[in-house]
């Protein structure tokens, strides 16, 4: 016996299905469902009178020993990922995603590959969007509270360096030396997110670099405040090649030790993560942006220049002065700061992100960037570029899937690949840690509904604890049980170099968290960047700072109004 319902009735019960489009927040972007794993009429839903009950969509006979029985299922989720926009159930077991498919009871339902049993909990994701937890690869570990702010924006992994509020940490993403690295690895035991630390990359003595990799650093940071010379960079890359770790570069703004071409000559054909490749965050003035054309450079933006607005240039001078410990009474310090800020290259940056020339977005937390705005600013750029440049190839009305996949890759899978952690995190795929962010569509990109970290709810919008229902005002983000007791040790990862892992750094420091090695880094090229691997010819006019791609000038207009702003953040 069949039952017919209208499309609007179906959507209100089970969320969108194939061909339906969902608007992302108050942006102009629409995600269209490409595939639905559901069998119409066999949808698994929880609640009074719903299907997930004993003997119905919940199997009464299975136990947790069955490998297909889930610990947790997110039902009828709209998954937005770098390679798919699909409607599916998400099965989680032992803290990992084990299946994207159809949940229910295979005894009475067809095509079930995620079994719901007595040991299964449910998160109702009907009508909601689920994305992979975001990855911020430019974090100054200045303040432990950054982790909570990031979680509440949809970020579940931090990579960078620092030791707290030292001048070194405030200016450079560096955790210098074995002693500091060990202390930060121990501090990470209580952080509710995944973390990895980068060591200081300035030393001609390889032993001084190698001891940091042995101590657990997942890479080296070369920063101009410590001296970003071609020599220092080359030595850091030598060690990185030996130990399969990444090098992140904040290049030489003043061109003291050479120009952009000299830096690239020192790099040779070795892979490198180029921080804030536009240059306002630091790097060869005025043409660092040209490095994004190289096939061995993995370029990222930091979020204060994204998107380009009428306020962007004005706010940057003070940020540079404070972050880099400059003195406003010294003319040379003012000149240094001023040389980094060029509206022409900033205006071009949004376009390069939209073309897939820039591959990643990060924060530069509390050091010329905002740790809670990586996700928001990424989608603001996507909105602005659709406004100014129209749909990408293959997109059309109510279908921005190609642009959406390009932009979500910038803070999920591509940072994971760049730093050797894509086997563990970065996408909604079977086998990966269940770091998932759930959004009401109208709040997408601004405020998540809840964050699942390693299979446990870690942070969620919830009401007054004395309320009679969970939605009693005030509704606000609250820590969930995933952050209490020993749960962090079972749901969050600490990333270390492979050599530190093999030498038992977790035993040496008595680390309780899941410790995992980074890997497969030194063989990367830009071709490995998902949906963001373009390598056109880039030129910068040395007088006007105008940017040209394959001979064509690129620029964007300064925004005076943006989505995902005051409408969402009045309270």
UniProtKB/Swiss-Prot annotation:
Gene giving rise to this polypeptide: ureC
Protein name in the entry: Urease subunit alpha
Cofactor note: Binds 2 nickel ions per subunit.
Modified-residue entries (N6-carboxylysine), positions: 221
GO biological process: urea catabolic process
Cofactor(s) it depends on: Ni cation
CDD domains (UniProt xref): Urease_alpha
Binding site for substrate: 223
Compartments, as annotated in UniProt: Cytoplasm
Pfam families found in the cross-reference section: Amidohydro_1, Urease_alpha
UniProt keyword list: Cytoplasm, Hydrolase, Metal-binding, Nickel
Assembly and binders: Heterotrimer of UreA (gamma), UreB (beta) and UreC (alpha) subunits. Three heterotrimers associate to form the active enzyme.
Boundaries of every Urease domain copy: 133-571
UniProt similarity note: Belongs to the metallo-dependent hydrolases superfamily. Urease alpha subunit family.
Binding site for Ni(2+) 2: 221, 250, 276
